[in-house]
A protein has these predicted regions:
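Active-site core of metal-dependent hydrolases
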Residues: 6-121
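Flexible inter-domain linker/hinge segments
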Residues: 1, 10-12, 166
């Protein structure tokens, strides 16, 4: 029989999983992004995306979703599949750093699914690496912020992240006086 300590956090891509699945260089760069807000290089994002995908698939996930909290008061998700058709009729499992970092929740670029042109899309999701990804119902849930293309917050997380950054900046300013 499994105990709580055996399965607690088992479906979370947390620091333990990152250390185990990422190279030391990639892990260090990701930690710098998380801890200091440094920009994430696309090669690091690709390595993290590959590790996340492999880990998620090993836990039974077949899809990923950018998970966010719009101002409606409930969570929202846009699901995509890891599965991509291959030229020989089979499938390959793919997930890129670009897909990890930024998503498009309103489907404006879908061939038949969008209600508006892509340039009219109301916003996009952006990965928040300070929150751990997790698996729910066989989907890798990637915590994201939801912003308009003009930079306006369209969710509850963006103001929190911005206030944390402002508080950090002012604390450093006061401490270095």
């Amino acid at each position: 029989m499994k105990t709580v300590t055996d399965y607690f956090g088992d479906l979370v891509f947390d620091d333990r999983v990152m250390k185990a699945t990422l190279s030391a260089k990639v892990y260090s760069s990701l930690r710098k992004t998380i801890d200091e807000g440094c920009e994430l290089d696309i090669s690091v994002a690709n390595a993290v995306a590959t590790a996340m995908k492999d880990w998620a698939i090993s836990k039974g996930a077949t899809h990923f979703t950018h998970w966010f909290q719009p101002l409606t008061g409930i969570t929202a998700e846009k699901h995509d599949s890891f599965i991509t058709p291959s030229p020989d009729g089979g499938v390959i499992m793919e997930f890129s750093g670009k897909e990890l970092i930024k998503g498009e929740p309103d489907a404006s670029s879908f061939p038949n699914g969008g209600l508006r042109a892509t340039f009219e899309a109301r916003g996009y999701t952006a990965w928040d690496p300070t929150s751990y990804a997790f698996i729910k119902d066989n989907s890798l849930c990637i915590p994201t912020a939801f912003c308009s293309y003009g930079g306006y917050a369209l969710d509850k997380k963006t103001p929190l992240l911005r206030s944390m950054e402002a508080l950090h900046r002012q604390t450093i300013r006061i401490l270095l006086r």
